[in-house]
């Protein structure tokens, strides 16, 4: 049996060893130790600032906490499950280092506001890192876009060829998704960057603390105005996991396209040896493991979001032990997004080569220029719906004859409608089809150049 003397001498009995292990979170919340130490240093300095402890005591506490930081970084501080959690582990080690003054650190503080502070410090840091990764990802997309403004690729709806577009246009669509992700995380950062320190267990404290002072030391932008809300709020974590899920949605969609494009059936890209694997039995295989793993890992992040929503939905105010379960969801969500962003950035930068000859063939061997025939007739005064129906018949007739639109003779065109002239061939040429779509945000080459300029400005603004 294990006696948990850290709580209070109210307990005479001891916890069953299995319950000790079940109750302990030190196995995963050790991830917060650097943030716990930083928060504790700020708390100690606030206690001295308000006269609750002496400056000398605060200095001893700060020195002891920094010693623990060094011990942890050097692999010397390895608390076991008997320590229950990172907060008790730090406090016990601190008391060993500085003596009884270490027991004063927890004055005017509860583990409830302490862990809330730690998680916010951690997530604030991780959000900044993920935003930086998104910028690297976006930069690679822009680099490819600059090189492929006039490289054409089939555009799809329903996974059926629809209209030819610029490859750069396709890549910049993912830039825009990542831009929304970057902006969304910035908004979540602001709501995460609020201090619960000083809220106590749930009702505040009788000590004359200065919550704004400790918040300023920790570079929080403000403090919670309600102590119950401060210790029980996990909205910011749910918002983060929602944003993380959207990042994974976007990466998974791109992954699916990389998988399709690398297949023999598409052959739009080839995978380099640095980002592909082989088969244990089929020597000809080159497998797109990176995008497949990213696509698969999206599910675990979605699961963490759902888990957090279910975790929070029935909790009465204020703190409940259920909230111990928030950390692994947050930690794994962070790590999964970061590793997937890194892998996809490497894949795009080093792992793929666009097969431009194959892409050129792909946009020339179908009827994806049919809309432009209808537009051609509409520009000559024929109602679009009438033109649309006529072109549908043209496609049906041409397909039955084994011909593409470009293969029809002028006589055949004019037999269909006298409005057709020799310039129809220019109008349906793939590059002209793409260049003509010059509306704002469209795939026209001039629009793409402007979009790249805007994208670069967004990258430089951060």
Curated annotation (Swiss-Prot):
Compartments it resides in: Cytoplasm
Molecular-function annotations in GO: argininosuccinate lyase activity
One Gene Ontology term from the biological process aspect of the record: L-arginine biosynthetic process
Annotated keywords: Amino-acid biosynthesis, Arginine biosynthesis, Cytoplasm, Lyase
Catalyzed reaction equations: 2-(N(omega)-L-arginino)succinate = fumarate + L-arginine
Enzyme Commission designation: 4.3.2.1
InterPro entries found in the cross-reference section: Arg_succ_lyase_C, Argininosuccinate_lyase, Fumarase/histidase_N, Fumarate_lyase_CS, Fumarate_lyase_fam, Fumarate_lyase_N, L-Aspartase-like
Any one cellular-component term (Gene Ontology): cytosol
Domain of life: Bacteria
Keyword Transcription: no
A family per Pfam: Lyase_1
PANTHER family found in the cross-reference section: ARGININOSUCCINATE LYASE (PTHR43814:SF1)
Family: Belongs to the lyase 1 family. Argininosuccinate lyase subfamily.
NCBIfam families per the UniProt record, alphabetical: argH (TIGR00838)
Alphabetical list of HAMAP family matching this protein: Arg_succ_lyase
Name of the protein: Argininosuccinate lyase
Organism this protein belongs to: Rippkaea orientalis (strain PCC 8801 / RF-1) (Cyanothece sp. (strain PCC 8801))
Gene: argH
